[in-house]
C-alpha cells in the first residue's frame, strides 16, 4: 500500500494562520491598567517586578548569616516578618514576587493569610501600589495548607481516565488556597512521563499526550475558572510546568539532559502545554534541564517563538529554582551570572526565581543601561507580570486585605458565605467533610486492579487479615512529595496531629473490624535519611500474630521523595520487600500486593506469587478509606494504567513507540495482535464487573473540502493535506455491556494506528477516551469522535501533515479499518 504525501507551498511564518487574535482574549480594562501602571514605573521598579525571592529572605531570623532553606524562624503565632528585610526587599529592590513555605512545612490558613497580607501591604506601599504575587507548590490539593483537602497525585488522577476529577480537584484546590490568600499555584505538572526511572513521574499525568493534555486542561479550568481575564475569589492562577520534555531525561534522573528532536517536541511534548494555554493558563515554569545541549532557559525558539509568538499568548514565563545560575554554574553556556541573565531574559524569561539573592536586579539594570537587554524586552516582561497580577485580582485591595477571623458555628446566611466578612467564613467549607467524601470517591476511581486470580477479591467480611509492609501504616508514602513539606517527610507528623485520616492498615481495620485485622510491618523504611532503598527489617516472623490469617495484604512500594532526592540507578523494588513477599507466599496464604509507589518498581519476581495486585499510586490522605472500600467490594475498580509498567530492565518503552522498538523475545515479537513484553500495558486494568465490547463501527467519515497547504504550526488543525471543517469528525460507535450485578464506571479508550506513512508511525496513539457509567446488566452504544486532523503528524520541517490512506481503530478487543481520502 502506498500513501501520497501532499507537498504544497510552505508558509514562512509560525503559528495559526487563521488565528490572529490572542489565545486569551484581550480585555480593554485589563490592558488599560497594565499601561497605566507601566507608564509610572522607573527601570528599578520594572526590574524588581521581574525578581522572585523565597519567603526565607524576609523572615524573622536569629542571625544575619546567609539564609538557607528552612533556616529561618517565622513566628507562627502572628506570622511576624523581619521589618528590615521586608523594607529592603520591597523598598530598595521593588521585588515583585515571593514564594515557598515558612519554616518549610505546611501552615494553618490563619498563618498564611497573616503573612501574605503583611507582604502584600508592604509591597503595595513601597512598589507604586503593586502588591507582590505569592506562589506555592499546591500540587494535589492545597498541600502546604494545614487541614486542607489533599487528593491523589496527578499520576493517580490520570489512571481514572475521568477528566471531571482533575477539574473538581482544581476547584477545591483553588478554593482552599484562596482561603490562605495564596493567589498563584505552581501546578499543574504536565511533563510526559516517558522514563520509568524519573523521580518526578508521579507528578505527571503519565506517558500519553492526550491524557496529559485533557487532564491538565481540565485542572487549569478548575483552578482558574471560566474567565482568565477576571479570576474570582475562589480561583487561583496556574503555572504550567515544566516547559518542556522534563520527563524525557536520557538518564531518568532529575534535571539531567534530554535528547528529543524538535519534531517530537512539537508533536508530543508541546501539545499538553498548548491545550492548557488554550484553556486559559496564565503562566508557565521552565524545565531546569537542557535538550541536546541547549538549556531550556536560554532557548528563544521554545520560549518566545513557540509559546509567546506562536500561540499569541500574553501570559508570563518564570524560571524554576535558581535556574539562571545554572546557565553559568552548571551548563557553562554563560561566563558569569550577568551573561546568564542576559541570555535568559532575551530568550523570553519574564521572572526569575532567584530565591536568596537580589543580584539579579542590579545586574539586569546594568544590562539594560549597556544596551544588551532592550528596554522593549523589559517592558514586555513587566506587562506580562502586571497582567497576571491584575487578572488574579491583586490590584483590588479588597480581595486580599481581609482578616482571617473566627469561623462561625453555623454557615453565614446568604448561601455560600456571600455575607461573610472574614476569611474563615468566606471559605467556610475549607477542609470540610463534604470535600473529604469527594476525595474518597476520587481515590476509588484512581486505583487499578492489575490481578485477581480466582476472584480472591473482593474479600468477604469475617476473614482474618494480616496487613504488612513498610507502606501499611505510614502517611508519608501515601501522599508522596509536595505534601506538607518538600519531600513529604512531615506527612505522618501533620496527619496524626490533625487526626482524621486513616492509613491503609487503619482503614482496613475499620472496614473489616479491628478484631479481624492485625498489623506486622515486617519491613520499615529508615526514618533517618531519604535513601529510598534503605529499608530495615522490623522483625520477620508470623509466629507473633494474634491469629492465623486467612489472607495477607502486603503494602509495598516506595517512601516519599521529590526531585533529585528521588534519583535511583536501579528500578527493582528493594530486596527486603521482595524477600518479605516471597516469605509470605511460602505460608500458603493468599497474598494481595498493594502497590504504593510514585513510579513502576520492577516486581516481576513476586507478581506470580500474588493472588491479587492493586496499584494505589500515591492516593493521599483518603487513599486508605478508598482502598478498604475497594477490597471489601463496597466500591468497584475502574482505573486503568496511565503508563507502561515494565517487566525487565532494558525494556523501558512507552505504548506509542515505533514498531522496531519491540525486539523478538521469548514472549513473542510485536505485531498488532501479539502481547508485549511489559508487566502491564498502558490502559490495562480490571474490575469486579464483566464488561464486554462488541460492534465497533465507523459510523461516519467526513469528506474533505479540498486541500490545505503545508505550514509550520503548533496544532494538528494547521495540518497540510485534506482540508476539513472545524466541526468535522470521524465518528465511531461501540457497544459496551456490563454482564454483572455490579455497577461500574468503564473507561472506553479508542486507539488509532496509521498503517502506512511517509515517516515511521507510532504503533498506535490514544485519540479519544470517555468514562462510561454502566448499571448492572446495562448495555450502551458509545459514540467516540475524532477530528481527522488529530491523525496528522509533524514532519522534519516542523509542518503538520495529514496523509490520506488506511488507518486502524481499536477499542478493547474490537478493531475496524477506515480510509481517509
Per-range role (PLM):
Residues 1-23:
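Bacterial Sec-dependent N-terminal signal peptides
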Residues 18-795, 803-817, 821:
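Glycoside hydrolase catalytic-domain context in secreted enzymes
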